[in-house]
């Protein structure tokens, strides 16, 4: 299983599937089509049934039931795209057998080193087979590891028909990294009662709480006049924008928050005297606090509009997704089964909130409750990303164990 996982993962990682937030197509990039078509062929090759790819690049397939029990249909999902923030072109994975616990030279020419001094969690991986970058790209373990693990688990079950299971659906989705993963996902066609995304981080992660999320876009209009004759005439939109930012609580930012704490995050600030644009994301686990954060932004905008003129400030707030806990709590047994599966395999479950979102955040509100399982990677979205092949094996084993438990608990 380990060698199969390594080979699958490296094959997927070499396809550039960065998503593009500025694209209006689905998938947003051609590389995702390339990977999707590859996955369709591989699903057929291992013996999966009902293998489909739709006009938006969503890949689905079925592992038919081999039991007479009335087992709920469960699904497993992973996303094909990688993050747009760091290049995913020409990914060249490096394989390190039996990691010795020391520095890993990713790129000798550029002096790029993956060191336990900077990333102390490396100490947990001594003796593991690691897959790293060559220091010039991201790796794409988020979430090509999840794809490889689902594929390998399905292949294992097909090769071991003595393991009884209900009907299982799998899906590989585009554009998760730009928040559009489920936008065109056909929940009815997928036909699962519950699902799991395999999109988490280190060994044991099990997540069913996500942020409530919104984005805010502020446009401020100024008045540009020659600075030599500007007294009483110029209105500098940059300074108004700075005033807006300064009225938000400075300590409620990503760099100062953790756990269940929410934040405001200024993503971009682009401006001139004449016009300035601010782009924020707003995050909070608590729905009331989430609404209060949005209200705070509206209050600041209204105050500045009163001070500088109503026509000078526009604020647009759009909700992006909500905390999936609200939809998963009524079917909490799906979390409990994942917890039991990990425990059965000697893995300590680490139940914690996702300081972010997954496809499951949106799917849960589309009628498909979907908690998140670990995929095994570390340091996602950058040159220091790596993954343990040993923990990829455990992720695939957890998928198999969850499927077995659903069958065993059915009548």
Curated annotation (Swiss-Prot):
Q: Which PROSITE patterns match?
A: ARGE_DAPE_CPG2_1, ARGE_DAPE_CPG2_2
Q: Which GO terms describe its cellular component?
A: cytosol
Which CDD domains would you find in this protein's record?
M20_peptT (cd03892)
Enzyme class name: hydrolase
Q: Which residues bind Zn(2+) 2?
A: 142, 177, 381
One Pfam family per UniProt: M20_dimer
Active site (UniProt): 81, 176 (proton acceptor)
Q: Which SUPFAM superfamilies match?
A: Bacterial exopeptidase dimerisation domain, Zn-dependent exopeptidases
Its primary localisation, in coarse terms, equals cytoplasm
InterPro entries per UniProt: ArgE/DapE_CS (IPR001261), Bact_exopeptidase_dim_dom (IPR036264), Peptidase_M20 (IPR002933), Peptidase_M20_dimer (IPR011650), Peptidase_M20B (IPR010161)
Per the record's keyword annotation, is Transport included, yes or no? no
Q: Which cofactor does it need?
A: Zn(2+)
NCBIfam families per record: peptidase-T, PRK05469.1, PRK13381.1
Q: Which family does it belong to?
A: Belongs to the peptidase M20B family.
This chain belongs to the protein called: Peptidase T
Query: What's the source species for this entry?
Result: Geobacillus kaustophilus (strain HTA426)
The primary gene name is pepT
């Amino acid at each position: 299983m380990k060698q199969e996982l390594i080979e699958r993962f490296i094959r997927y990682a070499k396809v550039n599937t960065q998503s593009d937030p500025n694209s209006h197509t689905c998938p947003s990039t051609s590389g995702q089509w390339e990977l999707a078509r590859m996955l369709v062929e591989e699903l057929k090759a291992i013996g999966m049934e009902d293998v489909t790819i739709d006009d938006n690049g969503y890949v689905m397939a079925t592992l038919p039931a081999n039991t007479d029990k009335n087992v709920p249909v469960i699904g497993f999902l992973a996303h094909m795209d990688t993050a747009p923030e760091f290049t995913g072109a020409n990914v060249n994975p490096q394989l390190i057998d039996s990691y010795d616990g020391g520095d890993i030279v990713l790129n000798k020419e550029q002096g790029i080193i993956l060191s336990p001094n900077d990333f102390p969690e490396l100490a947990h991986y001594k003796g593991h087979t690691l897959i790293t970058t060559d220091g010039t790209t991201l790796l794409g373990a988020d979430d090509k590891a999840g794809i490889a693990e689902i594929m390998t688990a399905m292949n294992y079950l097909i090769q071991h028909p003595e393991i009884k299971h209900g009907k299982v659906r799998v899906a590989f989705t585009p554009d998760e990294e730009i928040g559009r993963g489920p936008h065109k996902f056909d929940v009815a066609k997928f036909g699962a009662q519950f699902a799991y995304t395999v999109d988490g981080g280190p060994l044991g992660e099990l997540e069913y709480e996500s942020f409530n999320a919104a984005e805010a876009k502020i446009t401020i209009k100024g008045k540009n006049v020659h600075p030599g004759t500007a007294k009483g005439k110029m209105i500098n939109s940059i300074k108004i924008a700075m005033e807006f930012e300064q009225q938000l609580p400075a300590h409620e930012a990503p760099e100062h928050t953790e756990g269940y704490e929410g934040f405001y995050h200024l993503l971009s600030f682009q401006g001139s005297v004449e016009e300035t644009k601010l782009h924020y994301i707003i995050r909070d686990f608590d729905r009331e606090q989430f609404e209060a954060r949005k209200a705070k932004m509206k209050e600041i905008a209204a105050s500045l509009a009163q001070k500088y003129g109503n026509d000078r400030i526009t604020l647009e707030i759009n909700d992006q997704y909500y905390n999936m806990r609200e939809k998963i709590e009524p079917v909490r047994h799906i979390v409990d089964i994942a917890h039991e599966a990990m425990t059965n395999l000697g893995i300590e479950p680490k139940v914690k909130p996702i300081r972010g979102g997954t496809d499951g955040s949106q799917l849960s509100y589309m009628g498909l409750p979907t908690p998140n399982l670990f995929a095994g990677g570390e340091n996602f979205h950058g040159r220091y990303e790596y993954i343990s092949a040993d923990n990829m094996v455990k992720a695939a084993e957890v998928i198999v164990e969850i499927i077995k438990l659903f069958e065993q608990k059915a009548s």
